[in-house]
């Protein structure tokens, strides 16, 4: 890498962008199944956030504080400036973004960083330190996770970068994907539960054969038994269910019948 390359910002993305006229981005919120696509699309650039640079809104505030917040903020700001400028100068940029129903997505994100979320619970609730109550996990999830994150992700990330407002275009719930175009940006949004049936469409979109390679991560995680028990016993508060399932995000990407099924799932 040349001495003129920008200083260490986790530079793999920079080198990949520099080498490609028509880069492919797997650009989506975390915990929607991105690892399957990463392994299936060589030389793709994987992003969860670029335009939003406040780490505490995306991950546990406790975890964010472990990474020198001031330095991390500057790094994220520089990455946004450099990458967005490079992307807008490319001949074509293809972006794939997976979506998932938001409550399930937030549960997966919670467990991925479980120690940090529990630390936030203990730091903010003195009674939690002395308690052995089984609902501590439920309380930590409801009280400390930023539940708005998936609902706002497209408005905070895709729209500022590409100018594409996915909510102004109908989404084909049966097909499970939609393609959008603006200037040099092509965006394909795919529902993760429709990923396998969308492989041919993804291949057409990327102009290369794509075979999605699944490796089920959740069953092999250290927290798998806890996650199974959490899902068995967790009954979200009505306010949380309604906030998530009546949101613009959920109504756009899921049909009325599918949302009714999600209500049944989380109210049961």
Which functions belong to the PLM regions below?
Residues 1-268:
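Membrane-interface amphipathic segments in extracytoplasmic regions
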């Amino acid at each position: 890498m040349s001495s003129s390359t920008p200083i260490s910002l986790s530079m793999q993305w920079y080198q990949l962008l520099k080498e490609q006229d028509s880069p492919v981005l797997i650009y989506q919120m975390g915990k929607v199944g991105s690892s399957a696509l990463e392994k299936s699309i060589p030389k793709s650039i994987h992003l969860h956030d670029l335009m939003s640079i406040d780490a505490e809104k995306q991950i546990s505030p406790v975890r964010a504080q472990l990474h020198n917040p001031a330095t991390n903020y500057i790094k994220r700001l520089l990455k946004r400036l450099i990458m967005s400028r490079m992307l807008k100068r490319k001949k074509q940029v293809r972006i794939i973004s997976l979506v998932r129903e938001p409550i399930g997505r937030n549960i997966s994100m919670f467990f991925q960083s479980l120690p940090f979320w529990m630390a936030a619970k203990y730091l903010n609730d003195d009674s939690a330190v002395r308690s052995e109550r089984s609902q501590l996990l439920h309380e930590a999830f409801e009280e400390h996770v930023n539940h708005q994150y998936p609902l706002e992700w497209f408005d905070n990330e895709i729209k500022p970068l590409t100018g594409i407002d996915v909510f102004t275009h109908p989404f084909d719930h049966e097909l499970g994907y939609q393609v959008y175009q603006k200037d040099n940006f092509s965006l394909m949004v795919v529902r993760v539960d429709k990923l396998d049936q969308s492989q041919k469409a993804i291949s057409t979109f990327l102009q290369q054969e794509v075979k999605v390679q699944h490796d089920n991560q959740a069953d092999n995680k250290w927290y798998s038994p806890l996650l199974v028990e959490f899902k068995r016993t967790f009954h979200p508060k009505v306010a949380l269910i309604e906030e998530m399932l009546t949101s613009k995000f959920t109504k756009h990407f899921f049909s009325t019948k599918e949302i009714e099924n999600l209500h049944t799932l989380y109210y049961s």
